[in-house]
Amino acid sequence: MRCKKGDDAMKRRWKWTLTGFLAALALCPRFAGAAPHEDMSTVKTFAFSCSGMSVDQMRSYQIGETKRGRLATIELYLAYTFVLPVTDAELAAFSALLDELDLAAWDGYRQEDSTVLDGESFSLNVAFEDGSGIDAVGTNSFPDGYYEKKGAIQAFFEALMREYEIDADKIGYW
């Protein structure tokens, strides 16, 4: 006999997965009715972290493969860590998002503005299945479109959290 509560949870997960995936596709003009790039490589590992002078600016997002499957690790405010499974469809959507954001243009970015006393820093490391990658780091200096692209990455991981009924807006460091 199957557990009704478990069945309901699985239905909600698939509903949110499909909704998030369709929303991501609908918002990307490149994919609205178009086929994805044939040469677009799939993300193998991903790590993005950003920090600032306040705890609420400290976030870390990772995707990696383990023996038991692909996992996303989300760390917020140096206090909350969530480890969630990532499906093939979610990884494909994330790979498409990185391609759409043109994060490859950041590869090799290494800038620091040491004259700023307070500020923000970031680190990005992506490895793709085809062997290519992106490595970028900045302190008080950022590549073009940094805040918009950071927001898109954050939105992807927050959508993943919502699939598991975790509301990032209700999590605080206080």
Please identify what each model-predicted range represents.
Residues 1-9:
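Short, Lys/Arg-enriched N-terminal segments with co-localized hydrophobic residues
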Residues 13-32:
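Sec-dependent N-terminal signal peptides of Gram-positive bacterial secreted proteins and lipoproteins
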Residues 57, 105-106:
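Tryptophan-centric aromatic hotspots in well-structured domains and transmembrane helices
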Residues 58-62, 123:
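Short, surface-exposed charged micro-motifs
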Residues 33-53, 84, 97, 107-174:
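Short, well-ordered, aromatic-rich surface patches in folded extracellular/luminal domains
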Residues 72-105:
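A short-motif feature that recognizes glycine-rich, charge-decorated loops
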Residues 62-69:
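Short, solvent-exposed coil/turn segments at beta-strand boundaries
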